[in-house]
Amino acid sequence: MTRDDRVSNLKFGGISCHCPTAIMKLSVVLFVAASCLLAGAQVQATYKDGKGTTHWEQHELDTAISPDERERLVETMVKAHQIVDKERSKQRRYSPKDTYAPVNVPCPPMPEGDNYVGFVRNATNQSLNPNEAAYVKRHRQNNKRRWADWLKRAGMDDNGVPGGVDSFLSDERNQPRVGFAASGGGYRAMLVALGVAQGFDERNKTAMDRGVGGLLQLADYFAGLSGGSWATGSMAINDWPTMQSLVDDVMDLSSNLIKPSDDKFSFYKDLFNDVSDKKDAGYPVSISDYWSRALSYQLLNKTDHSPMFVHHGQRTTYSDIVNTTSFKDASYPLPIVLSIGRPPNEIMINPNATYFEFTPFEFGTWQPYLQAFFPVGYLGSDMRLSLIHISE
């Protein structure tokens, strides 16, 4: 199976030893594509000073949050950060476990195949990851009978399908290829993507009555960028619940992400603690860590309110998706999260910027000057010549 087979899916359904190893946090993956959204919003909302430093326009800041609210929020952040620094200066946790910080794990077995150089997969031949190809093949085999039922419900048995649906699908090459593509746009894009997924869900009676229900389960891929990736990741890591139950029982959308209504101090204290864990483990941190960790409170497993925020979503990794029941059964589309590369300090995204993708199996890009992939579960590992470097 090649990349062309996968791309055709998205075009068809474009709806819109111990080694120092970093376990990729799902919250970080949910963030990586958000730069596109932020960059688009900054076109008319920023200016550069004489030194070339970019600043927000004051009226944009005041629109997002009033000066008084901003001052109180900064005071809360500073207080939480000071307490975290004070506590951590007394007792550092050099080997955090089951936290947001990356951890050391046994070295994985070396991938097998002629197109692997160490742990890096050479994708110049445009072939898919063997695990991805196997998943999609099993998913399509599981859905052969369901495709026949769906096409018959759509009235295509005696109208438009030569020889009838059953005869047409007897050749596996005729089985339709469908993929969903969710655009960026923050929470709006996320909710639209969830609404679209619900509209094609076989568990939705209205969708079944209208003849479109079941297409979600039949699709081979569900890809998302920026806000669309928040929906994609949340659906997949939570084992594809109904969209209504995901919003009602898992997500916490009633609380503001920046100034939560429940307990601002606990929120920021836990946020600073988790990111500090990663820093203490020897890994670089950035604003991406704070933003993605904040997103995880709302989009991953249900928040533990006793105490508020603590441990919520911090242990979840993107590669955990492969352990869900739906993924093991290959009963839902393979999720793909997309992101766009952007150099430091660059505001506008270059039209020729590199697109990267994250699947539950690997991370990388198809663009010609790279065309390489790496196991997503070990992102952050110190690599030397395609091999994991073991620090002395």
Please identify what each model-predicted range represents.
Residues M1-I23, H389:
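Intrinsically disordered, low-complexity basic segments at termini and long loops, enriched
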Residues I23-V43:
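Fungal secretory targeting signals
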Residues C36-L37, A41-D114:
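Intrinsically disordered, low-structural-confidence terminal and linker regions
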Residues A45, A154-A219, N238-P241:
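Helix-rich "cap/lid" substructures immediately adjacent to catalytic or cofactor-binding pockets
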Residues W150-Q175, K264, Y268, T303-Q314:
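Active-site-adjacent bridging/hinge elements
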Residues G179, S183, Y187-A193, E202, ...:
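Patatin-like phospholipase A catalytic core
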